[in-house]
Amino acid sequence: VTGIEAAEAADDSVSAADAIGWLHEEGLTRLAALGSGSPNPAVAFSVDVSTGIVTKYPAANGGIGADSSTVAADDLPAPLDSSNRLVVVGITSSDQILVVDLAGSLVIGINGDRPEAAARSWVMQLLLNPDITVTTNSADVAIGSSPRCRKSFIPGGGGSIVSVDDGNPPVTTVSMNSDVEGSDYLDLLGDGTGEMYLGARVWPLRLVMTIGDTAWSALSETLDRAAG
């Protein structure tokens, strides 16, 4: 996984890698519990690598109660049964791990020369939740014969898209280099950095989590065998 490998190579690699590991072990399920416990559900979270402070971001257009709030990681609520549609997007320029709840967007874009690299990272994280099924019209993202990440014709799907369904409608559509400009999207800047936009909010990212072709080929082959 290119993003994790790059994090391990950075000066603060151990703490960044540990934070990402904690998120995938239990942190995402605890963030899911935090995000679901208010009238203004969170659309994103950031976890400060050095302090462990978690910032919760409701939708920027949520009106009253839409301001961000903070809590220590140790004070997060007990985990839910799943991480819902939370994905680790990358590491911000201020050394915070950015987590986005894809359930907060009907359509969210990934733009850049290789948008499928970031889409693969999201898909692999989403598949950790057994309730999620991914459908895509992109051969660069589908996993062989896996019923949980299959390639299929998607009506109305102009361009490459990924549909994320956890049984709780509406589904989230991830579009890659779409001609339709939306308010929620990740811009890949070509050097491993990027910018995440959710409505009026933006997070500069010094590292975007991606999965390159070689790693994806090995992962998809393993998952394809498991599905068979």
List each model region and its residues:
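Accessory regions of macromolecular translocation/handling assemblies
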Residues: 1-228
